[in-house]
Amino acid sequence: MSSFIGKLKNSSNNTEIFEKVTPVHEIKLGEIVDLLNAFKDSRENLLLPNMNDAFTKKLYSTYLSYLPTDKFSYPLKMNVDERGSFTEFIKTQERGQVSINISKPGITKGNHWHHTKNEKFLVVKGNGVIRFRKTDSTEIIEYFVSGEKLEVVDIPVGYTHNIENLGDSDMVTVMWVNEIFDAERPDTYYLRV
């Protein structure tokens, strides 16, 4: 914009200014409407748009900049029980989903394994232990984790795993999984570590 204004100020004849706008994105109006509706729906279904597409990325940024200031925030569905809570945060078709897990003191969650899901756990508050056991082995592997020392623990397929809160307060874990949860095909199999 400042380049355009500069040309207006420096031109002796303002009617002869011609500038080419780049980049040019070719897209149908109906596709733009679909994108705008998807942006609106993303606050409920948590699906982020494909940021690899330059036009989608720019349109999403523009969409957010036009939200009323009282609409910058939106609630998430917390699945709460006596053990703590599990809340889905972000989903993408290309890169899986991110969730927030809160575990009460002394609670162990998990004791399951996956065929195709791999996960990354990051404890950001509290202290705990993540345990693994290959499904065809008796050897148990332990990683002690803490919000005081941020480190990612990969959860590979074929390992039953759990996470236990060893602290006196809630433990908060950011969890990434490589695919969006599908209730019809959960790929989650109970097996104690």
Give the positions of each predicted feature.
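Short beta-strand His + acidic residue motifs that chelate non-heme Fe in jelly-roll/DSBH
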Residues: 86, 110-112, 130-132, 152-155, ...
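A short glycine-rich, His/Asp/Glu-containing loop-to-beta-strand
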Residues: 72-111
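Mid/C-terminal beta-alpha module of Rossmann-like enzyme folds, strongest
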Residues: 1-76
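Structural signal for conserved beta-strand scaffold positions within catalytic alpha/beta enzyme cores
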Residues: 19-21, 75, 88, 100, ...
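A short beta-loop-beta micro-motif enriched in histidine and acidic residues
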Residues: 95, 107-120, 147-149
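Glycine- and acidic-residue-biased ligand/ion/polar-headgroup-sensing regions
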Residues: 116-135
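Short acidic-glycine-tyrosine-enriched beta hairpin
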Residues: 134-158, 164, 172
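Double-stranded beta-helix
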Residues: 137-139, 166-193
